[in-house]
């Protein structure tokens, strides 16, 4: 991995040289508030308004759980500088299952019949089975867990990883320009990329679908294979292209790119979910999505 999380001694060595941060860490409360509001705003007159509102309910349950049951300090001293919270190898705290229970309790009163059945199933599932499903999801074996259950399990895991990321050093530096298609904090996949405004004007950051960190990747480079060739930008409405799909003819993948200069309230998870018809268009053109939205999991294998 080409982005390294710096120790305190390394931070002091680079303290006098400013450069745009390689990694941006989320403010948990602010992130959930912004995402929930954006989902509700996007739901207005949207063909998939019910699902966007369901996603907003889950995000608000994450915020409520965060405020009621924050993650206690973790023993994180001996972590690697590269992917310190690697989703496949980091020893997670079982508190994530408490988060799952609290999220389910929040959603249950509003649930329709189908969602209620999923909640009931998860409530009756043993701790060992929940951990096994979590292991599969964190190993990116998404087709081994049914998507209706994956949404809730991932919401709880993400809430845990987001808070764990607050407890590691928040300085980083780019080691080289390779292998930037996975999160340098937890090794998970991006949801989409955001072209920033403000102090990071014009810089592109990929947004992690697990720990919610963002990492810098230069534009005009494939977010999946690092190729600089055969890149194209697509949108459903060129005039209002807040969300575009960047396709790569080399690896035949795509990831969406969003532009804060067109709308400062754009939010990677919410706007990615609301632009699902762009995904359909890209798949019809033969491109495979290289990222994952925490509210859109692949169908379980039969």
UniProtKB/Swiss-Prot annotation:
GO terms for molecular function: ferric iron binding. InterPro entries: FdhE-like_sf (IPR024064), FdhE_C (IPR056796), FdhE_central (IPR056797), FdhE_N (IPR056774), Formate_DH_accessory (IPR006452). It holds the Pfam family FdhE_central. It comes from the Bacteria. Keywords: Cytoplasm. GO terms for cellular component: cytosol. One of its GO terms (biological process) is protein maturation. It is found in: Cytoplasm. Its main location: cytoplasm. Belongs to the FdhE family. PANTHER family: PROTEIN FDHE. Necessary for formate dehydrogenase activity. This is Protein FdhE homolog.
């Amino acid at each position: 991995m080409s982005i390294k999380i710096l120790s305190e001694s390394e931070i002091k060595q680079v303290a006098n040289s400013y450069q745009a941060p390689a990694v941006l860490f989320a403010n948990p409360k602010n992130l959930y508030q912004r995402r929930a509001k954006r989902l509700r705003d996007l739901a207005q007159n949207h063909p998939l308004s019910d699902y966007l509102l369901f996603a907003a309910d889950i995000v608000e349950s994450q915020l409520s759980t965060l405020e009621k049951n924050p993650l206690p300090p973790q023993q994180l001293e001996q972590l690697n500088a590269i992917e310190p919270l690697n989703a496949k190898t980091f020893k997670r705290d079982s508190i994530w299952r408490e988060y799952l229970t609290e999220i389910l309790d929040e959603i249950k009163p509003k649930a329709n019949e189908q969602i209620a059945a999923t909640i009931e199933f998860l409530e009756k599932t043993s701790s060992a089975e929940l951990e096994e499903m979590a292991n599969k999801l964190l190993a990116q074996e998404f087709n081994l867990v049914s998507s209706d259950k994956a949404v809730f399990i991932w919401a709880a895991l993400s809430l845990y990883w987001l808070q764990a990321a607050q407890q590691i050093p928040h300085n980083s530096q780019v080691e080289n320009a390779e292998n930037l298609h996975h999160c340098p904090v937890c090794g998970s996949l991006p949801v989409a990329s955001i072209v920033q405004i403000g102090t990071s004007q014009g810089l592109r950051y990929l947004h992690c679908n697990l720990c919610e960190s963002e990492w810098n990747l230069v534009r005009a480079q494939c977010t999946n294979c690092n190729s600089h060739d055969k890149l194209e930008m697509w949108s459903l409405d060129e005039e209002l292209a807040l969300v575009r799909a960047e396709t790569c003819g080399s690896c035949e993948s795509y990831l969406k790119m969003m532009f804060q200069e067109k709308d400062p309230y754009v939010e990677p998870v919410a706007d990615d979910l609301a632009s699902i018809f762009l995904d359909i268009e890209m798949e019809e053109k033969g491109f495979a999505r290289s990222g994952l939205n925490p509210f859109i999991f692949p169908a379980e294998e039969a």
